[in-house]
């Protein structure tokens, strides 16, 4: 499978080089009018997600703002690799663009763990205000820059919430519940502090785990709960809102620096528009949910 992905990627890169190798001269400008291959953007998320909406809107805006001379193709569902592979390929310049949750990035950029501190924010508007703050954004851009990426912005899928078959009304109701978490020490420490029993598990095993009773509960943003039909195995959503589920849009620093100033500006403007659009879509999706009981402990 990895060899297959490498072959696919090599084909993308060959085309990308044809377009990007001569940026800045007249021949390249003429060539750009008939860009033969689109730059790949990789994601590990399924199609029907805000992550995909974010990626597709970005690609659409890049094409619109460049009058069709800059093209990006979005590849979801880990077609170009899982989260770790995408980050590695992006850093090496093999996959120019990646859209993904910030949690997998902590291994590469430990300071990104700032988003793993639980119960810091009360509303998603407060989260957005902070991540858009010029000073904070500048610091995070430096973190990504030091690692070989250019951070173009953060959208989100709202907060992460808990699903369970227990009607949680107080802190004591968390006690003993086996809850699936990502393999993240900060996440696990939070649930331990509440008295629950955090159980790291790959996401592909969550539905079966709930069905077979291997785990009692899990935590994810609403959209993931709905798109993966976890409500079929769970009766309650507990609005813990313990962490914002942030989605980053990044580009390889090496690739970005090889573009003209005009192209870079188009990419930044497209990213800003896509970010705002993705946030609107996230809010609308969350507001439309009515599949399971919601409790607020």
Task: Label each region the model flagged.
Residues 24-126, 135, 142-295:
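N-terminal secretory/targeting leader peptides
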Residues 15-16:
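Repetitive helical segments and hydrophobic/amphipathic motifs
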Residues 129:
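Short beta-strand-centered segments that line the small-molecule binding cleft or hinge
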Residues 9-11, 296:
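Intrinsically disordered and other compositionally biased segments
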Residues 1-9:
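Bacterial N-terminal signal peptides that target proteins for export
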Residues 11-12, 136:
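Generic detector of short alpha-helix boundary/capping microenvironments
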Residues 19-22:
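C-terminal motif of bacterial Sec signal peptides marking the signal peptidase cleavage site
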């Amino acid at each position: 499978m990895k060899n297959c992905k490498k072959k696919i990627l090599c084909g993308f890169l060959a085309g990308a080089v044809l377009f990007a190798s001569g940026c800045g001269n007249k021949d390249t400008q003429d060539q750009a009018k008939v860009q033969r291959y689109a730059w790949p953007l990789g994601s590990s998320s399924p199609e029907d997600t805000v992550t995909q909406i974010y990626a597709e809107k970005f690609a659409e805006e890049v094409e619109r703002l460049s009058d069709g001379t800059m093209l990006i193709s979005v590849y979801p569902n880990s077609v170009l690799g899982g989260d770790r592979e995408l980050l590695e390929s992006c850093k090496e310049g093999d996959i120019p663009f990646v859209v993904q949750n910030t949690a997998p990035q902590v291994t590469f950029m430990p300071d990104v763990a700032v988003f793993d501190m639980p119960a810091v924010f009360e509303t998603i508007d407060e989260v957005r205000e902070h991540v858009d703050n010029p000073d904070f954004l500048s610091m995070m851009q430096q973190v990504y820059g030091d690692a070989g990426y250019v951070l173009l912005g953060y959208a989100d899928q709202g907060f992460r919430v808990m699903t369970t078959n227990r009607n949680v009304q107080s802190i004591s109701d968390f006690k003993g519940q086996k809850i699936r978490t990502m393999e993240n020490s900060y996440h696990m420490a939070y649930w331990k502090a509440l008295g629950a029993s955090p159980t790291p598990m790959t996401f592909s095993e969550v539905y079966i785990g709930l069905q077979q009773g291997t785990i009692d509960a899990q935590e994810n943003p609403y959209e993931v709960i709905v798109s993966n039909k976890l409500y079929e195995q769970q009766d309650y959503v507990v609005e813990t809102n313990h962490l914002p589920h942030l989605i980053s849009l990044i580009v390889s620093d090496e690739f970005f620096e090889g573009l003209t100033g005009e192209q870079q500006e188009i990419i930044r403007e497209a990213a800003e528009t896509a970010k705002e659009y993705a946030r609107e879509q996230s809010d609308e999706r969350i507001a439309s949910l009515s599949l399971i009981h919601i409790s607020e402990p």
